[in-house]
Amino acid sequence: MIKVYLAGSMFCEADRMYNALLAEKIRERVGEHIDLYVPQENLSINDKTKCANSHDIFWGDYNRLQNTDIFIARIDGDIPPSGTSAEVGIMSQRRQYWNKGLQDYCRREVADYVTLSSSELEENYIRMNGREPVILGLCTDSRNPKRTYLEAKNELMKNEDYESQYCYFNLFTLGCIKVNGELATSIDELVDKLEVLVNERK
């Protein structure tokens, strides 16, 4: 089973409903091939009517992250959720370790005069260690400058104070997502990208 982790803000009713909708659409499309973890569904550590224990929350989610194949980071909102940003960092580091492990493995095999191509060596490494973890980001903010009229907005910002039309994102968090995967701007686009990744890993 391909392990998928859905991260994002979950503290207000709107967020929980959105997460539930997203999880439903994911399960409808690829549910038979994945084990989807949605933190808000894990009431053993995320029942907010009870006293939260930071150790239990950290280890509960961290242990899931260590076995996650595809990590989905929902980063909508004025500021990407701090917990989600931390998890993006953990997944980015896991991917870097995976890539370093592949490089070390290929280097050792070449040193031992193994006559395999680089693609064959990578296939062997994947058989032993699984595929590299991937991050999929989801941001549906309508202020995406890629799809708006830049010239008119730039003119307004040039002549008026505090008229920035753009949403701000922490570029470190955004970079972690883009370097280690892809960013989707709608639920449908996200589910399409996820389906491609799942089909590659089945």
Map each language-model feature to its residues.
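Conserved catalytic or regulatory cores that recognize and/or transform ribose-phosphate-containing ligands
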Residues: M1-K202
